[in-house]
Amino acid sequence: MTHLSAPRRRRLLAVLTAGALTVVGLSPATPAAAAAPGHDKVVHTVPSTASPDVQDGSVDAIHDAGTKIIAGGSFTRVQNRNSDVDIARDYLLAFDKATGAVDTAFAPTLDNEVTAVTAGPTANTVFVAGKFNTVNGVTRRKVALLDVNTGAVVTSFAPPAFNGLIKDIALVGNRLLVGGIFTTAGNPNPRGGLASLNATTGAVDSYLTTTLTENHNWDGVSGAKAGVGAEKLAVSPDGTQLVVIGNFKKADGVLHDQIVKIDLGATAATVADWNTARYTPRCKWQSFDSYVRDVAFSPDNSYFVVVTTGAPYSGTLCDTAARWEAGATGSALQPTWVDYSGGDTFLSVGISEEAVYVGGHLRWLNNTTGTDNARAGAVGRASIAALDPANGLPLSWNPGRHPRGIGASEMLVTPTGLWVGGDTLWIGNFQYRRERIAFFPLAGGTAVHPTTTATLPGNVYQAGLPQPTNVLYRVNAGGSSVAATDGGPDWAADTSSSPSPYHNTGSSVSSYTTAASLDSTVPAGTPVELYNHERYDPSGGAEMTWQFPVPNGTEVHVRLYMANRYAGTANAGTRIFDVALEGAVVLDDLDLSAAAGHNVGTMRELTVVSDGSIDLEFRHVRENPLVNAVEIVKTGPPPAPASSPVQVRSYDGQSAVGAPDPVTDPNGTVWAGARNAFWVGGTVFYGADGALWRRTFNGTTFGAPELVDPYHDPYWDNVVTNSGPAGQTYVGATTGFYAEIPNVTGMFFSGGRLYYTLNGQNGLFWRWFTPDSGVVGADRFTVAGASGFADAGAVFVSGSTLYKVNRNTGDLAATDWVNGVPAATFTVRSGPAVDGVDWRARAVFVGP
């Protein structure tokens, strides 16, 4: 396992300026909002050359000071790009934002590390905080105000002497909020990890006095031990909310384990009605007293994201990024989404309108069950990544940062791009040398795939229309329905609770968890799942019989799928039975173990002309007769396919259904094998061949089919991580959803989620999904209380209505859809018996 602690650092952009004040030294009742970064895309994957090369330590705090960038950390030396001349800079430096040239006029001397930098109360000033005690020989215990142009100490700001280090600061109005590991802010001022200062004079005030107490993990006997207090502060851009994370259990004596939210009122900061127990678990308590590492607010004030270390402990928020809704209230709150690294530390987070940027010691994301390895759903991301704000899944942005070192310890989103600080020298796989600080410009970035969906009234597309077939019956004897993989009809269910109407009573069912092998008699495309269930006839009573109505004079093939799966009859001669067709024995003394072998699926095809029904009887000889599946297929050439595999109808969502119009599909998706589809933002996503595929579609023209495989990246899959087992690379692992696709009967996209139904299952399921990268969430969820989907042949949603196509009848039914939950009952709105419209198809979706 690779969990490393970075020297702590960082920034918080000032959310207000002193110019917003009406009276010097007082916060306004309604603070002016900070400007949002205004991003309309993710930043470029190629870093700018306009940054210097920091030669040692790490860059842990970055501040955009207009024409300059000011960086703090644990470094002591820097070089201009393309120079080998060291420039001494102890823990703090400034450089030109346009050229990257080190500022020769700004060279303050500090005696220890800088952990945070933010704007000062007036133009051309900047606050710095950290471990230091002197600046330019002037005593400044942990916090100072400097002149941006000269690096001189602004002596009018005379802060108290904090008795411990300051981890983070934030300017709100004319107050400087301070968080760290301290118990006093000057001798007469007890403060437990949080304090507020007059931003002009430095005087301690009584605005923020919340006291943080008790170690998270250290209990006096066991666990790692660290100082108690605040690690990071995040202020909402409107200046009304403060989130504090750190090593503490209580805030003002009330349990707020590692995180507390504070309301920033006009005259006092008070603990908000916001609490969660999700950061209570100890996780790797031997190594970490606290495992929260960074927090950032969204530009619209609506949510914040917390990132952590702590090792991979199932069911916890260790080694995760988690989104929390700022407007939520109460106790026992839960995150909106969680992204798991599967064993690696997150260190930093920055948020734009389009992405949640995270950094750390990462190898993968979407890796819920990973333990220092890539498990189902894992997507390789070396150290830095961009997440979809709606669901936390990785977007396509993937420049990487390898080697990873301790990790990317700082992320700062600005109107022009993204700054990343850390302890290593390269962006990409030794691709772009950017020593310890890099800038990804917004210019040249890529727009995130739209998440707009089509609505009704509008168009409904049916792709893979039911084709004429010679298959008359398919039954999965003893099991639930199984999706066809050959374009034909599905295999109908025959369970104990819902037995097939085509056999008599008195037989029983058995199930097996391991797959059988298949011999050469089994037709290609036959689902192997058929052999996981059987219907057998115990001794005594009438023999097991099956009867299928077939028009008189029709010649058919009767196909019996069988396998000996029971270990007690594994040997030849231990299970023998006869099969009679139309009263005559056609399989005499059938011994499956002798004929095919134990745990081997086989098939016997019998040809007969119907006299009005096909009658089968399974007769005892020794042990119990059995059958796994029955298929009846009319002989002769297959019927001609329908003229167009795709058609569109107008539909108002109620009762007005338009006539079908064909849609040309020149690129030739085999829609007959599709496992439904949905349209989002100009792209149709559909299941086929055990995977998701995507095609652009504008309502008239389909683009070329493209396999959706974000779990493998030609650039990164062969790059060795230098962690874990020898030779481990950043290659991901295909999502578990792909194994479900052969049984998917319907799917739609809504609110960052992919909802879907499964063959033979009554519920409605969902996973997170981002159309930008095509990543499907590693975790499957079930919509609580949803039922009635066992007969679904398609599902789609429009506004507050959920629609379901009945695959047995072709009816279209609807129900209310409120907050991602369907109402209890469906009402038929259209169908063959209602208006003559058959809604069945392999893929049914609302589109442009």
Residues of each region from the PLM?
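Extracytoplasmic surface signature
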Residues: T2-L4, R11-L12, S27, P31-Q462, ...
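Well-ordered beta-strand scaffold positions
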Residues: S480, A584, G682-T683, G752-R753, ...
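Short, low-complexity, Pro/Ser/Thr/Gly-rich segments in the mature regions of secreted, periplasmic
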Residues: A841-G847
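Hydrophobic core
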Residues: L16-S27
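Primarily extracytoplasmic ectodomains and periplasmic/lumenal surface modules that are beta-strand-rich
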Residues: K68-I69, S481-A484, F685
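Compositionally biased, intrinsically disordered or flexible polar/acidic segments
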Residues: A454-A640
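Extracellular/periplasmic catalytic domains that process cell-envelope and extracellular macromolecules
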Residues: H63, G350-I351, P466-T469, V608-S610, ...
